[in-house]
């Protein structure tokens, strides 16, 4: 009976948390490490020349799993990143938050779409340097183009 209680407690313990992380080179000599825990907060650290340059975090308000991808989202040759998750409603849209690396600030800066509140189902048009997403106006899906 003791072993059963220990196994049951170990499985259902509220103190278990899952952390996931990704590391990437932002540009030559600059690295970023991004960690997300329990779908509530994304923490990041930027390092250069073997020292920490910046640390920060972003709160995320979702009940769904958080995903992080890195890539060049403003087409400047430096790696940026996005946080994305499925919407909390019917779960049919992906919500993206876009963070661009600013060499001037030596930090990531969140950008917003040109229309609507969020980047929904984000796509990139590298040729035209556009971020393409959806937004809703009067309950109708519209195409939003954000130039970067």
Q: How would you label these PLM feature ranges?
A:
Residues 66, 79, 96-97:
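Residue-level detector of short, conserved catalytic/binding motifs and their immediate flanks
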Residues 3-12, 16-38, 121-148:
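Acidic, small-residue rich beta-repeat scaffolds with periodic aromatic anchors
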Residues 64-73, 117-132:
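Beta-propeller blade termini
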Residues 75-86, 129-132:
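Acidic/hydrophobic-patterned starts of short beta strands in beta-sheet-rich repeat architectures
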Residues 90-94, 140-143:
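Short, solvent-exposed loop/turn segments at conserved positions within beta-propeller repeat blades
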Residues 17-71:
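Terminal domain-start segments
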Residues 85-87, 114-115:
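A mature extracytoplasmic/lumenal domain signature
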Residues 47-49, 92-113, 147-148:
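Beta-propeller blade repeat segments, especially FG-GAP/WD-type strand-to-loop junctions
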């Amino acid at each position: 009976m003791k072993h059963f209680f220990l196994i049951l407690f170990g499985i259902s313990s509220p103190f278990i948390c899952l952390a996931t992380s990704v590391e990437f080179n932002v540009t030559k000599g600059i690295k970023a490490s991004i960690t997300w825990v329990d779908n509530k907060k994304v923490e990041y650290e930027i390092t250069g020349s073997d020292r920490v340059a910046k640390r920060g975090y972003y709160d995320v308000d979702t009940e769904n799993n958080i995903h992080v991808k890195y890539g060049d989202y403003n087409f400047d040759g430096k790696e940026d990143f996005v946080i994305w998750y499925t919407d909390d409603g019917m779960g049919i849209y992906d919500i993206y938050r876009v963070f661009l690396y600013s060499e001037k600030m030596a930090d990531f800066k969140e950008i917003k779409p040109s229309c609507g509140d969020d980047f929904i189902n984000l796509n990139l048009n590298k040729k035209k340097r556009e971020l393409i997403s959806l937004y809703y106006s009067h309950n109708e899906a519209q195409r939003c183009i954000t130039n970067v």
